[in-house]
């Protein structure tokens, strides 16, 4: 099931990254392609900075960390995927999707973008 911080949230979801972030993260081919081609401004992400952010999250040293979306296993209720947002630079935040030690995707947003066009229908209520 899919949950969003603005729709339906359980306190345990705030700790999702404790289960999903690993010391050595892998990247999907999908994300690698975006990092290599930088085909859109939102993918203008420095690989080393991305890995550094994930290592800081793993070490509980990343400031301004905001977990905003979580997926759970339909049968067990265990957290299987999480999306979080944190500072990237003075103008942008980065959102990162992780699952079992793998960075599925990541993108940049202006730090003031609050995602007001959220589609609440796709989240459990």
Predicted region positions:
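Ribonuclease/tRNase effector modules and their secretory precursors
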Residues: 1-125
């Amino acid at each position: 099931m899919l949950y969003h911080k603005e729709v339906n949230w359980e306190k345990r979801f705030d700790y999702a990254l404790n289960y999903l972030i690993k010391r050595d993260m892998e990247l999907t081919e999908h994300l690698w392609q975006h990092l290599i081609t930088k085909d859109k401004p939102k993918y203008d992400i420095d690989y080393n900075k991305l890995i550094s952010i994930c290592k800081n999250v793993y070490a509980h040293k990343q400031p301004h960390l905001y977990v905003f979306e979580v997926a759970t296993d339909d049968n067990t209720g265990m957290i299987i995927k999480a999306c979080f947002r944190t500072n990237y630079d003075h103008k942008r935040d980065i959102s990162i999707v992780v699952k079992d030690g793998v960075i599925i995707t990541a993108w940049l947003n202006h730090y003031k973008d609050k995602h007001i066009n959220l589609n609440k229908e796709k989240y459990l209520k």
